[in-house]
Amino acid sequence: MENYSDQGGDGIELLDLLFDKNDGILRYENMGQQNNQLWPVQDPHMMMPPQGNEDFFNALIGGSDSVSGSPVWSPSPSDSGISEDPHSDHIDSPPPNASPPMEPHIVVSQTQHSLNINFPFDFNGWETGFLPDQAGGTQCASETPQAQPATGFPLTVKDLLLSGTPETAAKVSQQSYQELILTEDEKRLLAKEGMTLPNQFPLTKYEERILKKIRRKIRNKQSAQESRKKKKEYIDGLESRMAACSAHNHELQRKVFQLEKCNISLMEQLRRLQALVMNGSNKPVQAGTCVLVLLLSFTLILLPNLKPFTDTKVSQHGDFSPMRVQSRSLHNLQSSRVLRNLDHPYSMTENAKILPRFPEDKTMEEIASLLGRLHRRPQFTEYDPESHNHSFDQHDEHHHGDPITGHVATVTLNPRRGSRRSPHADDM
């Protein structure tokens, strides 16, 4: 460290000698990036002498005694929380974004009081670049791997120059060495994968990738859990609705079954009622028909027999009513008697005494007497009984009536005629 402190002034003089715009050796070289081009790169096979390279770094580091405690910066944003100083001036800002990353470049600006140089170094490995030696010449340095500092992060000249301020150094140190807090899920996943992470920042790129991977898995797991939870809630809702619908469906089916049974019973009762109505309507019709037929038959059979074949008499004295006369058989009998009397003539008195009188003869006498009484009445004065009826004494005639038509037939017996057979008339 004493060697570094002794050579601090020589390093500043060396930088002035190299980068002075008026008298500097590299004043004609384009050290910045213009038109998207970097400063020229020499042949990588030209090796820089080891002594000159060591002197160059000793001169750069000699301006500060706190090299080991200088803050480190991460060149790119990450989850470790390391970022560049937000209060840096636009003069100290890095080149435009169009430049290729990880390429070494130098931006030089000179002021009256101080010289700020933004010259990032990648100690993971040098590729190409200009490195001045103590003699003031320019030599090309090829890949010259250097020993990596204890922190494992690249250092810049800006960090080295600003590290002399105690407040800035404390602030950067506080930001750099923050504690890494891991959740239980992150610790469990790290243990499952067999990886470990330090408890404090900064983290390497590999560790940052591991941390990002673990956190991404945790986010995916939480998202999957939320999705499964929502899906489960949705399925539970559907199941509850399906259960309610099933219960309602069973209730409706039960009601339908009851209605079907009621309908079947009503149909059976309707059929029975129809059968009863049909049977009841047929029986009266048949009974009525039979009764009518029987009545008609009895009427047709018994009507002719309702009037008896008996003698009718006058109910009152002086009334006239038709009466029944002798039948055909009796008429023939009387005719035979008349003919027999003609063959053996004798007096009527003797005949009356000898022969018995039939009931018909008595009836005829009664009729004759009745007609005589009618003739005596004043309303029948013009009635001539002689023209209608003749007694046996006068003309020896008999009045006979037809039993079917009721007409009276007149038979006249004339003893003067020589005919043996007496003519008679029949109105049948």
Swiss-Prot record:
Coiled coil: none annotated. It is a single-pass type II membrane protein. Residues 212-241 are annotated as: Basic motif. The keyword Metal-binding does not apply. Residues 304-428 are lumenal. Glycans are attached at residue 389. Controlled by regulated intramembrane proteolysis (RIP). A fragment containing the cytoplasmic transcription factor domain is released by proteolysis. The cleavage seems to be performed sequentially by site-1 and site-2 proteases. Residues 210-273 form the bZIP domain. The chain crosses the membrane at residues 287-303. Residues 93-103 have a biased composition (Pro residues). This is Cyclic AMP-responsive element-binding protein 3-like protein 3-A. It comes from Danio rerio. The gene is creb3l3a.
